[in-house]
Amino acid sequence: MSYHSDVANDELTHSIIGVAIDIHSTLGLGHSEEAYHNALCIGLEDEELAVESEVEVPLRYKGEDMGLRYADLVIDDEVVVEIKVKRHLTDKHFRQLGTYVEFLEKSRGLLLNFGRPTLDIRRYANDQHVDKKGA
């Protein structure tokens, strides 16, 4: 897994971040993860982006199912978005995003933390995946 803060700011992630910043500015602090999740779905769909919500992430080891996890959002079948409302992000949050990006075979992900006065944005790049549209 590779965690990067310097992943290329491509047009798609730029659009996602723009919507997230608008939501954070408009709604402010103090809402649930579900509220920000729903607002992101509305805002991203208004931008005519394809939004998948609560995407199943099948976990497997040696071909055996270990259960399911759920990624908050997958945008345009390319970018995994995880939403948090935390005072501070931890390595566990980054590992969670990385697991989802890799198991879903996507090239990149965004971790958006609405629990701070300024929206906290972290980027993840899956170096093992070559994005057909160019991350």
Protein language model regions, located:
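Solvent-exposed, charged helical/coil patches
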Residues: 1-50, 119, 125-135
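Well-ordered beta-strand scaffold positions
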Residues: 49, 64, 78-79, 117
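Short, well-ordered secondary-structure micro-motifs
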Residues: 63-64, 122
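Conserved catalytic cores of phosphodiester-cleaving nucleases, focusing on short active-site segments
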Residues: 28, 51, 73-87, 100
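Basic/aromatic recognition patch in beta-strand/loop cores that engages polyanionic ligands
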Residues: 66-71
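Nucleic-acid nuclease catalytic cores
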Residues: 84-131, 135
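A short acidic/basic microdomain associated with nuclease active sites
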Residues: 47-63
